[in-house]
């Protein structure tokens, strides 16, 4: 697994805990991604995208399967590269559930791509570092465009307030990307 320098220590530790060797390269997701592609090609490894891979999307879709018995009318899903949103939408759309994506203002590459603007963005700094994606995946872009009912843009101040309220009122320390849908 390749992660950029500066990746949160808890994420590195979490990946290593499950037996993966973590290599750090570059200062951004994109630099780490390019290095991972290069390693895969040079060593005949299978490259596995963090979000733009059918197996990853299917795995993340199991969250939608877990939600389905609770018969929600609407599910809001954080979007970075689109794997989670694609998987959850695939699992829930046949149940008649509205699926809405959520992105942070200035980190809204999927919302832009769905509207036809596929240019890379310079993602803003955000507490939701797990969704800082310059360009969403090709597969996930097609799935999100077809399956999502809407994408809402959340202001950083709203995200910050949500994280504080979760900590103070619920005694819950949440990752920024996870709290984005709240």
Predicted segment positions?
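PLP-dependent amino-acid enzyme catalytic core
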Residues: 1-182
């Amino acid at each position: 697994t390749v992660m950029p320098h500066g990746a949160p220590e808890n994420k590195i530790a979490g990946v290593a805990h499950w037996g993966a060797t973590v290599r750090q390269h570059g200062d951004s997701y994109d630099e780490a991604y390019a290095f991972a592609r290069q390693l895969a090609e040079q060593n005949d490894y299978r490259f596995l995208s963090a979000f733009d891979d059918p197996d990853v999307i299917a795995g993340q879709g199991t969250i939608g399967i877990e939600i389905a018995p609770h018969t929600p009318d609407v599910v809001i899903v954080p979007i970075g590269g689109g794997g989670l949103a694609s998987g959850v939408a695939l699992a829930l759309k046949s149940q008649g559930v509205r699926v809405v994506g959520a992105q942070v203002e200035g980190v809204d590459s999927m919302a832009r791509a769905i509207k036809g603007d596929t240019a890379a963005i310079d993602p803003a700094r955000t507490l939701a570092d797990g969704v800082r994606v310059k360009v969403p995946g090709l597969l996930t872009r097609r799935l999100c465009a077809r399956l999502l009912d809407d994408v809402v843009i959340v202001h950083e101040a709203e995200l910050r307030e949500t994280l504080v309220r979760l900590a103070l009122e619920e005694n819950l320390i949440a990752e920024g990307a996870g709290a984005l849908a709240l």
